[in-house]
Amino acid sequence: MAQKLHITTSPHVHCGDTIERNMRWVVWALMPALIVSFFVFGVGALIVTATSVLSCLFFEWFITRFILKRPSTLGDLSATITGILLAFNLPSNIPLFMIVVGALVAIGIGKMAFGGLGNNPFNPALVGRVFLLISFPAKMTSWPVPAGIAASYIDAETGATPLNLIGQIAGGNTAAADQLPSLGNLFIGNTGGCIGEVSALVLLIGLVVLLCAKVITWHIPVSILSTVAVLTGLMWLINPVLYVNPLYHLCSGGLMLGAIFMATDYVTSPMTPKGMVWYGIGIGFLTVIIRYFGSYPEGMSFAILIMNAVVPLINNWCKPKRFGEAAK
C-alpha cells in the first residue's frame, strides 16, 4: 500500500533559530561578567543574582499558572535573563527583600501585565530597576568598593562610582578628578558600581559572542556607543577641565551593559536596521544629557525606557518599502 502524503502548513524549512536558542546564548554571554563580579565584589554578587533569578522564575510561574491560567513559559529562559539583568543593575550589598520586590515589579508589571513575552513595551528588568531606584534611592546609590572574593555581603564598604565623580567634576569640583580610577581599571573591572558594570572587557566579550551567534546585530550597540563617544568627546574638547575623556563614559556605569544586553531586546527595540540606528542614537543622546544635567549620575536605564516608548513611532517611520512600491 502506497504511503500517504501528509501536507502541512508552511514553513517547511527551519533554520533552527528559536527563542530558547537565542536566550541560551544570551545567558552564556552574561556569564563572564558574573564571574568577574564575583572576584570583584565577592559572594554578594552571587547571592543577589541567585535571589533575583529565583524570584523572577517564581513570579512568572505563579502568575502564568494561577492568574493567567496558561502553560508554564519558564522554558523559554526569558524570566531567567530578566533575573540576571535585574541583578546586574543592582549593587552587590542590596537587601534581599528589595530584590524580591524588584523581581515582582519586573515580571508582574513590566512583563506579565501586558500579556507576557512578546507583548511588553518596556524592558522588564529596567522597569524593576527604576522602581527600586525611585523607591529606595539610598540603598540603590550605595556602591560597594572592590574588595575581592572575601568581601562581606552585609558589611561591604561603600564609595563613589566613576559616574559620581564625573558628575562632581562637571559641577565644578575639579579636585574629584584625582579620585577617578585609571582607564585600565575601568576596562578590566576593578571599580565600584552595579554587579554588571564591573568590566567593559567582559561585556565586550559578550557582545562578540552574541554577534558571532547572530543573536543580535551591530546596529544598536554601535550606534549607542558611537553617539555617547561623539557627544562626550565634543564636550571634552570644548572644556577638558569640566568634562572628562569620552573613554571614561564608555567604560563607566551601565552603558556597555545596556547597549549590548538591554537595548537589544527583540520585543522592545525597532524591527529594521535603520530604525535600530535611530533608536540607538536616541538612547546615546539621552544618556549623555541625563549623566551631565540630570539628578541621577547614570542615565542609561531612563534613556532605554524612554526610547522603548518611542519604538512604535520609529517602526512606523522606518517601515520598509513594499516590493515594487514607488519612492515617495
For every predicted segment, state its role:
Residues 1-57:
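N-terminal signal-anchor module of multipass membrane proteins
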Residues 1-24, 292-328:
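Cytosolic-side transmembrane-helix boundaries in multi-pass membrane proteins
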Residues 25-33, 48-60, 78-83, 87, ...:
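Alpha-helical transmembrane segments in multi-pass membrane proteins
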Residues 42-55, 93-102, 190-200, 243-255:
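Structural signature of hydrophobic alpha-helical transmembrane segments
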Residues 58-70, 107-118, 205-214, 260-269:
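C-terminal ends of transmembrane helices
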Residues 84-153:
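Membrane-interface helix-loop-helix junctions at boundaries between adjacent transmembrane segments
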Residues 121, 125, 246-254, 276, ...:
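Loop-to-transmembrane alpha-helix initiation sites
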Residues 124-204:
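Long hydrophobic alpha-helical segments that form multi-pass transmembrane helix bundles
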